[in-house]
């Protein structure tokens, strides 16, 4: 299995993975702009040119505290590849990358419905932070 960061030519395969994992459509132009920058990266695992697992990483540096955080979104594994340890492998790779880049924290949000994913996060040492998520549609 090949580990890589998402490139423009990988976008169609990534869109299929996100559709499979979350039943949502990717905004291709926004995704393309995001991966061209330096703040957002998508770590992907490929088998035969198909992305079978991935995580979107947004790096944030708090200018007041000087702390670097890797914030994870769309941790996903293609349904036919689930149960093979890829979710754990994704998290291990992110933690290793965060350590290598001197990050202070790795953070993510997860739906209560995603029981398998939440188990992985707890098993990998993540804790629930005492925070409420506020949201306002504009």
What are these regions (language model features)?
Residues 88, 112-130, 135-136:
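Conserved active-site alpha-helix within GNAT-family acetyltransferase domains
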Residues 91, 98-110:
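Conserved GNAT acetyl-CoA-binding A-motif
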Residues 75-77, 110:
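Hydrophobic adenine-recognition pocket in adenosine-nucleotide-binding enzymes
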């Amino acid at each position: 299995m090949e580990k890589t960061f998402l490139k423009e030519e990988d976008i169609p395969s990534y869109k299929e993975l996100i559709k499979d994992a979350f039943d949502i459509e990717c905004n291709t132009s926004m995704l393309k702009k995001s991966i061209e920058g330096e703040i957002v990266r998508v770590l992907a695992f490929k088998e035969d040119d198909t992305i079978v697992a991935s995580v979107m990483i947004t790096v944030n540096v708090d200018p007041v505290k000087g702390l670097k955080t890797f914030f994870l979104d769309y941790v996903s594994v293609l349904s036919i590849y689930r149960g093979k340890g890829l979710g754990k492998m994704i998290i291990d790779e992110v933690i290793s990358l965060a350590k290598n880049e001197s990050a202070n924290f790795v953070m993510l949000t997860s739906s209560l419905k995603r029981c398998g994913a939440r188990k992985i996060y707890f098993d990998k040492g993540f804790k629930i932070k005492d925070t409420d998520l506020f949201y306002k549609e504009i």
